[in-house]
Amino acid sequence: MVTIHLQPRDITMLSLLGDVGILDTERLHARCFAEVSLRRCQQRRKLHTEQGLIRSQKLAVWYGDQSGRVPTLFTLTERGADVVAETTGLRPFRVHRSEPKPETFHHRLAIVKTRLALDDGFRSLDLNPPQWIMEQDRRPDAKPDEPPSQQRLLYHPFSSGNVTITCQPDAARRMSIPRDAARAETGMIDLIAFFEIDRSTERRGQVLSKFPGYAALIEQRGWLRYFSSATAAPVRVFFVCLSQQRINTLRECLSEHPLASVLRFATMLDLTSRHPLTDAIWQDTSGRRREIVRVTAPLAH
């Protein structure tokens, strides 16, 4: 086996994998090896895999919305996590210990794409990106004999009479955002954000079935379990969809729902905006486009 001398960008890559959980070739190259060719990046990745630092998997099934090669996905191994811990003093949180189904990989990669786009939006405003809670993150007190879904930090059960309803967002974050990005003197506010990655596979009834859980989560402020000091923060539920047509369908389905005012919709393409926080890419149920962070004057970018 060839010995590899780890460079700072290698540690950056391993740390990023341990933070977001999964990356594809495109994002791994762009974020960790942008100064070298794709071929050189692939050669380096091969060494990482041979050394047992990362795990690669080419999906047998790909539901991509664009033609092209089936992506290879990368996750951090326990050995890779050990290397990061020894080098930085911080052990990565998200290490894959099993092989999820292809559809789970698809879903988690879409969550990561959303996260990275919004993190870039925070950096564009000279703000540190908030921490995320991802769908696979486990409760500290989770028991091994519990069903996997119930071990998740974002699993919220609520009693409604003799029935238990649940809410399981795909991701969550507590955002501390400017009241006005152009006027620092206006200060900051908190926003609790939940995310739903919509793959256009759920029918109307399946979509609507999510909302008793969201209603209970918002009414009972279930996020205080992990965002304990955000007692008065407003809530938004952000749907990230594959197409505008799908957004139109969801808007029609949800426009009269009691939670309509907290819903926002954008496409994956919308998230390629350079400024996904201050650009009006998020549609409400009426179709009006809104921003997450208000800006009353042009920003110097």
Where are each of the predicted segments found?
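Nuclease-adjacent, charged terminal/linker segments that flank catalytic cores
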Residues: 1-102, 301
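Extended serine/threonine-enriched, polar tracts that run as long, contiguous segments within proteins
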Residues: 174-176, 196-201, 216-219
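Active-site metal-binding core of divalent-cation-utilizing nuclease and nuclease-like domains
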Residues: 64, 117, 123-191, 203-213
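Structural beta-sheet core signal
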Residues: 173, 194, 237-239
